[in-house]
Amino acid sequence: MAELPQSRINERNITSEMRESFLDYAMSVIVSRALPDVRDGLKPVHRRILYGLNEQGMTPDKPYKKSARIVGDVMGKYHPHGDSSIYEAMVRMAQDFSYRYPLVDGQGNFGSMDGDGAAAMRYTEARMTKITLELLRDINKDTIDFIDNYDGNEREPSVLPARFPNLLVNGAAGIAVGMATNIPPHNLTEVIDGVLSLSKNPDITINELMEDIQGPDFPTAGLVLGKSGIRRAYETGRGSIQMRSRAEIEERGGGRQRIVVTEIPFQVNKARMIEKIAELVRDKKIDGITDLRDETSLRTGVRVVIDVRKDANASVILNNLYKQTPLQTSFGVNMIALVNGRPKLINLKEALIHYLEHQKTVVRRRTEYNLKKARDRAHILEGLRIALDHIDEIITTIRESDTDKIAMASLQERFKLTERQAQAILDMRLRRLTGLERDKIESEYNELLEYIKELEEILADEEVLLQLVRDELTEIKERFGDERRTEIQLGGLEDLEDEDLIPEEQIVITLSHNNYIKRLPVSTYRSQNRGGRGIQGMNTLDEDFVSQLVTMSTHDHVLFFTNKGRVYKLKGYEVPELSRQSKGIPIINAIELENDETISTMIAVKDLESEEDYLVFATKQGIVKRSSLSNFSRINKNGKIAINFKEDDELIAVRLTTGNEDILIGTAHASLIRFSESTLRPLGRTAAGVKGISLREGDTVVGLDVADSESEDEVLVVTENGYGKRTPVSEYRLSNRGGKGIKTATITERNGNIVCITTVTGEEDLMVVTNAGVIIRLDVHDISQNGRAAQGVRLMKLGDGQFVSTVAKVNEEDDNEENADEAQQSTTTETADVEEVVDDQTPGNAIHTEGDAEMESVESPENDDRIDIRQDFMDRVNEDIESASDNEEDSDE
């Protein structure tokens, strides 16, 4: 074997060589083959084909030329690849079912929607379409840069002027190395309207752009289901758009029906679609179809007829066809294009911005080119004017000169002319000396001066240049714009977000002591008289009971604040709806709580982005904090810190406020403090709070609520033994934050410690929940109004071992409630049809943890009435005693 010269051997590490070679190949595919330029929307092969057509003068007014000649010219001059790839690209640009606005006018067989290939290039002919001229317009006016071709013997454009936004209008598709692009076509009128809107308002949002650009407009028409996928694609550059065939159900006599498909989704092979339908019928996966035929023709367009059996439901069959065949499919949007030579994922606005900047550059460069030409011509005309003014001397000078060079030098010296002006005079024909020609030169010169002034104004003022771009785009829109083909159907299944699939209704979300959660319709609980026994709201496990309850809409957010000061978020519909007797699902199946973490408060919120609403926090040791609600708008699955506090403290309650309310904090031993929210400076999400109330020994905070400073609301107090009362908020004077508070109830063995303190207007209903899962619904107006020192009246009869665990209030919007007598006599669990809306949530804090007990009546109604009357009398006595000692009590703050 002969030895190779050492100078020709270059030793390389194979790993490095493979890496560099693959990167070179990848970049070549990305930049020079597979991805379109964001400015003209063309890949190199398409750009070279169109430029080749332009160079051959194959305009729409010229005869067609053989495709083989076009392909050969493009391959030899600009695209040194296989002729088949060039021809296939040209064929696609000629197909009116592939391009929304075809760029090649083909004559002959250029394929079909059934997947039929085009005839060989030796049989077909082609030329440019009229709209293609707009892609190439002004290309010879230095509007774009030219680069060397593959062998350096020719020049080709790096990008076309593209006087309309072709990237969005005709879309693009390509597979590169490690990335791919798939951009849907759009309506020319809509896209140009979007560019015009952007030019007038650079800060326009994508939602505002979508008022102009409704969505993709496919050449095969069809339907697009909803705008959610479109909006996602326009905002992020990626998304999935649901496309559906246009199908009608027609009567065909004898009670029979047929399904007629007249439009199919973009890029769907019609023949394969029909084969798929036939296959499903053959395999008996779809029943009821008796005949299937393709009646498509040039006269009728697409027409696929599906005959339906007489006893079959055509609508059901059509829905099955949508589900199981390409009659309905999706278009995966991936808007990747070359931006400054680099692949980039762009959204709708970015695509329009890059195009608009390209057009400004094209118009600016064209204006500079025209200005240069105009100044050159004006310069020549100035010389001719001088010559005409001194024609006799000019002729004498020329006659006396021996050579052209001497004549030119003499003219330059004597009349102060430039070389170009002198040459123009020497080249001037004698007929230009006539009076008519003199007038033409003068008129042309004056017109040129005006034209130069206009061009200079365009270059001097960006707004004038931008207006010129707008005018030219508007002209193209008027010439080539057409009606939208694809219909966007709103309200379809695919247009709906998750929450849109679920009816918006008022619900109750309950959370048990052992952290089992569920939701129920709020109408499950019927309204009853005070002192009723309630209905079973859930079946609890051993030593478990309902600890918290909120009323809200299925579409609202529910925030879960834990004893550790963390916050989690769910939508109302994300909580499983179960039966009234069901225990629910473990809360850890819905949110990721830590082992020793429990829910302190649930709050329903409609708008988490609100800058006008605040959250007020209260801890067991009397610490309070106020934070903007918007701080909690983005909460991930793992939750976020809502408040920091000491290790021996825990979060008790959180309330939603407007920022101008009074804060009410109540304790288990019946102390309550009222102070203005304005004394709480808004803090960050993770900040610790400040002292809200000074606690006496052994006391803890059990309730937090808010009230308007001018309101006529009342403070509702509920005790663990089922007693409650209403006291006007005005009886609680405004004091400084951090005080000990004043007495809000008399605590006895009969009524027990406080479990809930909240504000009411008297128009609400009250839901009281026991540790046994029993829920009763009361009209707040039926609860007696007492002074601060009163013990309250019985709200609910409790069985042995039962106590009140939580309380919530709801507003009534319908007075059509069940009759009170019927409610007392009813032994079923049927509910009243009452529509309600969330007003507030008042989760209590259970002090005991005893197990469940059977509901038993331990007192007769007559004895209960006597006890209540006697207790009301004792309450009034206690009020008189309390009022005498108020000053001494208040001085302890």
Swiss-Prot record:
Q: What is this protein called?
A: DNA gyrase subunit A
Instruction: Please give the PANTHER family that the UniProt record associates with this protein.
Output: DNA GYRASE SUBUNIT A, CHLOROPLASTIC_MITOCHONDRIAL, DNA GYRASE/TOPOISOMERASE SUBUNIT A
Q: Name the EC number(s).
A: 5.6.2.2
Q: Where is this motif: GyrA-box?
A: 528-534
Other comments on record = Few gyrases are as efficient as E.coli at forming negative supercoils. Not all organisms have 2 type II topoisomerases; in organisms with a single type II topoisomerase this enzyme also has to decatenate newly replicated chromosomes.
What GO cellular component entries does it have? Answer: chromosome; cytoplasm; DNA topoisomerase type II (double strand cut, ATP-hydrolyzing) complex
GO terms for biological process, alphabetical = DNA topological change; DNA-templated DNA replication
Gene Ontology molecular function terms on file: ATP binding; DNA binding; DNA negative supercoiling activity
Q: Does the keyword Membrane apply?
A: no
One short Pfam family name for this protein? DNA_gyraseA_C
Its job: A type II topoisomerase that negatively supercoils closed circular double-stranded (ds) DNA in an ATP-dependent manner to modulate DNA topology and maintain chromosomes in an underwound state. Negative supercoiling favors strand separation, and DNA replication, transcription, recombination and repair, all of which involve strand separation. Also able to catalyze the interconversion of other topological isomers of dsDNA rings, including catenanes and knotted rings. Type II topoisomerases break and join 2 DNA strands simultaneously in an ATP-dependent manner.
